[in-house]
Amino acid sequence: MEKMRFPESEELPEGVKEIEVKDTFGYCTELYPDVEYAEHSGKKLHLQIMTPLVYGQDLKWPLIVYVQGSSWHKQKLFQSLPTLVRMCERGYAVAIVEHRESELAPFPAQVIDTKAAIRFLRMNGAHYGIDASKVALWGDSSGAHTALMAGITGDAEYLPEKYPQTTTEVDCIIDWFGPTDLVAASQYPSAIDHDSADSPSGVLIGGKALHDYPEDAYPAHPVVHLRRNRKTPPILIMHGGSDPLVPFNQSCILYEALKRMDKEVEFVKFKNAGHGWGGFMSETALDIVEKFITVDR
């Protein structure tokens, strides 16, 4: 978009400080809060939709669907807002997905909800200035697990009932330090419990200890849903080397599985970074994400 230029004023009253600043262009942001997209047993689920704001032009923006991590519990939906607003400034629409918490609805409810949100946005996105033909699915931590599950399974399984004629498939997935093998997570050093019935993973599979019920955890592993003969969206993995909550090995498991099946994947390790800190909020991190999203495939 070209910016409108006006003549420079020659006025400079005494005492006024005049400086030159580097011209960096970014869009303002418009928020559509609490857009209802689904309801389950009386619980309404919402999207927080943000789009770049341009007056006087009917523009459509490529879409980022974001799943906020929460250990699959009730989400703090605006936790990643500073990062996501900066993506709006770069020219993307962003929709933050509220999903059912695992205490109320175990796996695969979160995956089904995310796919319902994608379908809703494809059907109704034009109202919000969204180009729903270009969809990137992004999540952090447990949200990345949900994004991986939704993106990898696509239209094959875990489908919502509404808008059955509308695809849930996405163009790419951004996985920020997501769990990929729930059972294996307990085999590596971590600051939290990954195995007991009341651990985040245990609650996700219905309040069961993973070592007692590995067969119930198995379907919640993104890697087991990879198929050589089924299209997998390109995946960008980003993980901190010193993550205290989701072991770095979790991303290695996914990366190696994708490479074995000749799937498109990029893996970036943030040296000495933790669980979402140590560089993930930097412009460098967002540059990596944007470059991956905009690749002409």
Where are these regions (language model features)?
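Alpha/beta-hydrolase superfamily serine-hydrolase fold, recognizing
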Residues: 1-297
